[in-house]
Each structure stands twice: as C-alpha cells, then as structure tokens.
A protein has these predicted regions:
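Core catalytic region of metal-dependent phosphoesterases/phosphodiesterases
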Residues: 1-64
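Conserved beta-sheet core of the metallophosphoesterase superfamily
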Residues: 80-81, 87-177
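An acidic, phosphate/nucleotide-engaging active-site surface
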Residues: 43-94
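A general structural motif
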Residues: 27-30, 78, 106-107
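A generic local structural motif
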Residues: 21, 69, 95-99
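Generic structural signal for beta-strand residues in well-ordered domains
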Residues: 24, 63, 74-76, 103, ...
Length: 180
C-alpha cells in the first residue's frame, strides 16, 4: 500500500533520514519529541508504525505521544513546560493555547506547533504571596515552521507566515523566550 506523497520531493524514508541529519547539530538541546497529526494520520493509523517514536529512539530522547507537562529543573527551580503538537488551523493561535492552559493550569510555558505561526509572548497576571502582590509571568509560544508557502497552504488560502523557530531559555530566576 503506497500513501500518496502529493508532489513531495522525497519519499518518506528519505525525508526521515534527511531530517535526522539536519537536526544532528542541535540534538543535545532537544528535551524530548512529542507526536503530532502527521505521524498519527499517516504512519500510525495506516501502517501501525510510529515514526516519531522511532526518531526519538534514534536520537536518544524521550518520546511522548500526547500533550502534557514536562518539568525543567534549573538548580533548585522547577519550571513547568506544557507542550503538544496542536491541531487547530485557526487564525488566532492563542485560542488553542487558552484551551491548553485551562487543562494544564500549572504551566509556566505553553508551547504548540501545527499552525506554523511563530511567536513567543508573555502573559502577566497577579498572585498573592505572603501578603504581597507579585506579577507572575507565563509564556504562550507557537513553534513556527521551516516551510515557505506550501501548496496545501495556497490551496486553503492560509496566510503567508515567516519561517523560523522559538527558543526558550529556562533560568534560575526567569524564563526568556524569543523567535529566530
């Protein structure tokens, strides 16, 4: 059984090999891999083969099929990163992040991909601690893309978005995020 590649330049196995080669320089910065819609729709549902799980094993990082929490420890500080692939193509990327934050309410950083939007923005709120009001900062991040303007995006009249990625730096006292 052959899955249509709809004009893609490489066969799936070649895509996988080339992707592993391309991320080799940053593998030491990857905390884990989470599954997403492409691997579920194509490799898992049709073939019973989880390409993201195999990729995680190849590069030696944990694999998580579903969205969820990850604890990032920096010295004595524990930060809660909530991440997932995402599934909505909505124009407002915050809507899906709002849903995620409602379910995973203890998060410090909320990170989703899927819709190719690229941003990292703070959300400030007030918290009471020892009779003192303090600003509590959380982050909303959409992970970006490396595609220019794919045929499927043209077909659906999706907006053209800039290519790039988000960097998240967890520190002892604060979290910094920026787009590249």
């Amino acid at each position: 059984y052959k899955i249509s590649q709809r004009g893609q330049l490489m066969e799936p196995d070649e895509q996988h090999i080339r992707f592993i080669e391309r991320i080799e320089p940053i593998v030491d910065k990857l905390l884990f891999i989470r599954g997403g819609n492409h691997d579920m729709i194509r490799s898992v549902n049709i073939l019973g083969f989880d390409v993201s799980k195999v990729m995680a094993d190849m590069i030696g990082v944990p694999y998580f099929r579903l969205p969820g929490y990850s604890i990032v420890r920096i010295c004595d500080r524990k930060w809660k990163l909530v991440s997932g692939h995402g599934k909505s193509g909505a124009k407002n990327g915050d809507t899906e992040l709002d849903k995620m934050a409602a379910v995973y309410s203890e998060g410090d950083v909320f990170f989703l991909g899927h819709n190719h939007q690229l941003y990292a923005k703070p959300l400030d709120s007030l918290r009471i601690s020892m009779k003192e009001e303090k600003v509590h900062r959380r982050w909303y991040c959409r992970g970006g893309s490396f595609l220019k303007y794919a045929d499927y995006a043209r077909y659906r009249f999706y907006p053209i978005v800039r290519a790039g990625w988000v960097t998240i730096e967890f520190g002892e006292k604060e979290i910094k995020t920026w787009t590249n």
